Amino acid sequence: MSTNKRRTIQIEITEEHFKDLEKALEALKGTQLPFSTTVEQFVELILSNYVATSNKISNLAESGFDVASIQQELEKIGSAAGADDALKSFLDELLKTSQKSFSNTKDGKKNDDDNNSSSKS
């Protein structure tokens, strides 16, 4: 989470979603995130990781990899694990992805097709 060229955005979420974020953050503090991590920083991390993951999925799809099959398997795993376990597993994977992504130098390319890889809800 770079501090240069930052932009402020405002989002409104329900109190229930905020509490869910707090709960997920508390589960990760001290193990995968510093104890001082705020909900706002956590949201920034989630968004950054979503974009990085989306870009990687798009690149895999463009190279001919069967992304749809992998997504279906991940959905099955998430459903079987339950909501809390699925959330923690999802966040664990995002953190791994971000660590790999942020350790590589950026090539300056921007992928505007992120919405195409996330058309399913």
UniProtKB/Swiss-Prot annotation:
- Where is the region Disordered? 100-121
Supply the source organism for this entry: Mycoplasma pneumoniae (strain ATCC 29342 / M129 / Subtype 1)
Q: What is this protein called?
A: Uncharacterized protein MG202 homolog
Superkingdom of the source species: Bacteria
